[in-house]
């Protein structure tokens, strides 16, 4: 009984630690007090001011564009890489697997400096393309690991049976592997989107003044105090992220049920 109460209290403390700051942020986005120290009444004026803050909206647009592109490319390349690591034997396979974990475990500052040196050596101007390549680089291993873990749970006999029945490798990939891996693919995309949206360290090294993204914009703003418009924008992004997670899970579930029934 005591152990159950301790476990319940421990879990409650963890959830409170995780979600109370988010709740405070959402509440303050509707608080008429500019400093958010005490509640002074409900208002939506911070959302109205946000709509007129061109620099903040432009940074948000840049971040959303970067997150969508980097998540899409990282998911595409990472999913195919995971399939290759799962299905085929080739020279250098252990090296490729090891390098993926090296990228995942490397400190952000190390990756940031490495990418900056690479761009300088190649003569690439810092801006959209350097930032996109960098975000794809650090998102890619997470997609590979997520999709590969899903593939490892497959029944290999199903793939062998499809091959014995004359299915080509492309048909096996399209009809069996991808539909069954779709939940992991969707999870990899959402994870990549989130990693791209909140990255500060790598982005601060590899972006240029012509392409300012939201995390760097907010970081520069909070040095002189958190603006209520930032609370409003964070609330909108939080709702957007929640909608994407729910939608990706529903889409992945529907595709898994529908496509696996069509395998012949």
From Swiss-Prot:
Coarse class of the protein's main subcellular location: membrane
Subcellular location(s) per record: Cell inner membrane
Protein name as annotated: Spermidine/putrescine transport system permease protein PotC
Keywords from the UniProt entry: Cell inner membrane, Cell membrane, Membrane, Transmembrane, Transmembrane helix, Transport
Function, as annotated: Required for the activity of the bacterial periplasmic transport system of putrescine and spermidine.
Topology class, membrane: Multi-pass membrane protein
GO molecular function, one term: ABC-type polyamine transporter activity
Spans through the membrane: 8-27, 66-85, 101-120, 129-148, 177-196, 232-251
Superkingdom, taxonomy of origin: Bacteria
Organism this protein belongs to: Escherichia coli (strain K12)
Biological processes per GO annotation: putrescine transport; spermidine transmembrane transport
Keyword 4Fe-4S: no
Cellular component annotations (GO), alphabetically ordered: ATP-binding cassette (ABC) transporter complex; membrane; plasma membrane
Family recorded in the similarity comment: Belongs to the binding-protein-dependent transport system permease family. CysTW subfamily.
InterPro entries xref list: Bact_Polyamine_Transport, MetI-like, MetI-like_sf
A family per Pfam: BPD_transp_1
Signal peptide limits: none
């Amino acid at each position: 009984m005591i152990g159950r109460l301790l476990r319940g209290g421990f879990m409650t403390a963890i959830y409170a630690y995780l979600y109370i700051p988010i709740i405070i942020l959402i509440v303050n986005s509707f608080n008429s007090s500019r400093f958010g120290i005490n509640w002074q009444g409900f208002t939506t004026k911070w959302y109205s001011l946000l709509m007129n803050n061109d620099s903040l909206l432009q940074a948000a647009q840049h971040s959303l564009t970067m997150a969508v592109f980097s998540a899409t490319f990282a998911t595409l390349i990472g999913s195919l890489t995971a399939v290759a690591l799962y299905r085929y034997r080739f020279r250098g396979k252990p090296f490729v697997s090891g390098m993926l974990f090296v990228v995942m475990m490397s400190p952000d500052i190390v990756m940031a400096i490495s990418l900056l040196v690479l761009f300088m050596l190649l003569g690439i101007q810092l801006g959209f393309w350097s930032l996109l390549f960098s975000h794809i680089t650090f998102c890619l291993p997470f997609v590979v690991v997520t999709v590969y873990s899903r593939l490892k749970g497959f029944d290999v006999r199903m793939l062998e049976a499809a091959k014995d029945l004359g299915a080509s490798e492309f048909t096996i990939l399209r009809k069996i592997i991808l539909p069954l891996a779709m939940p992991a693919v969707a999870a990899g995309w959402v994870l990549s989107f989130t990693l791209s949206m909140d990255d500060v360290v790598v982005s601060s090294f590899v972006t240029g003044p012509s392409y300012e993204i939201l995390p760097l914009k907010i970081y520069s703003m909070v040095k002189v105090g958190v603006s209520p418009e930032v609370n409003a924008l964070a609330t909108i992004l939080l709702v957007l992220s929640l909608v994407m997670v729910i939608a990706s899970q529903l889409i992945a579930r529907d595709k898994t049920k529908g496509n696996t029934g069509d395998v012949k």
